[in-house]
Amino acid sequence: MNVKTVEPGEGVNWFAEGWRVFKLNPIAWLLLLIVYFLVAVVVSVVPLVGKLALAIIGPALNAGIFRGARNLDEGGALEVRDLFSGLLDEQRRGPLLVLGLIYLGLVILVAMAGGILMFLSGGAAWLHAMQSGGFGMHMPLVGIVVTLLLSLSMLLVGAAIYFAGPLVLLEGMEPFEAVKVGIGACLQNVLPMLVASAVFLVLAVVASIPAGLGWLVLAPVTFAAGYASYKSIFST
């Protein structure tokens, strides 16, 4: 598995490619994503364990979307059952669920690290304020920096797991190796991902104008763009 470092402009091309893949079968995309969001809502509202369960099966569901997108891109069909293909695959189900547990563990770890940093930095800022006789701008600035670091860490974890899912399902990679490769791919392609994020933000504003109806197109195009980024960055 080779990981490419692509040009920043690829971030725009991913959405163009996502639009192309979406146009191959718009109805199938909409049906698949409606089922996806219904599953997410139903699972997440289960008391006590719902959100934990969704975090664990989430990578498998996302990987199933990648499999369906690849089938469609290669001349096959995109079907609703593709969404569950990772969970129904006897060989890949276990590794995908392990990947979900890794994701859950990383999220908890980052959140704990953020809390500890906030506590320690807050204590240091308080001590500085006591010594200098005033709080000034130090305490809010510390909070902003810690929040920014926490947000960036969460984004990196999310992006790495987003790539790790298809690496496990489509390439047969083991979960920990897939996470390692996913993180490396994200770090190698920060600029195109930032460009893609900027494109998404602009499109999100446009999609929200007509009573949010534009999201019926933007949501599947964004998922298809995610597949396009995977195809662009990874090669066998």
Please state what every model-predicted region is.
Residues M1-T236:
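Hydrophobic alpha-helical membrane segments
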